[in-house]
Amino acid sequence: QKLFGKEDLTYLRPLKQGGQYASAETLTIKGPKGSIDRVRVLGPLRDYNQVEVSKTDCYKLGIDAPMRKSGHLDGAADITLVGPLGEVCVPAAIIANRHIHISPEDAKKLGVVDDEKVVVKINTIKPGTIEAQFKVTPNGFFELQLDTDDANGFLLRQDDFVEIDLEKKL
């Protein structure tokens, strides 16, 4: 309400993760050294604020966000959220860990559990391997989620395929 003057978000389009959506609302995020405009707000609303940033974003904003699992905000960096009707400073900025969304049904088929770590092989023209953690959620759409720094480092694009090495559970 403080930022947009209303209780709910305006639905814009669905996200791949079941029940989640991009809203029409955008805001500016500000740190001590800079700001980033037109940051899309995702719904549905939760009972906490979270801003997922990359390390490159941290440099631009002048913040030191910790790497955390989504929703785990202990030690999150302070960030100012600026909407059309006001602004608020909240401890909400994190660098999200690399994670693989998966439904409970698919997790059972693959023999993996929530928070389990695996090796992911990336076979682009700039190949490599990374470690990622499973995030088992109801209606989870099977998808690897990386920040822009990781994706750009491997020249990955949305909807590219990667290989999960289930033999190399960590």
Functional labels for PLM-detected ranges:
Residues 1-32, 37-115, 121, 131-161:
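Short beta-strand-centered segments at strand-helix junctions
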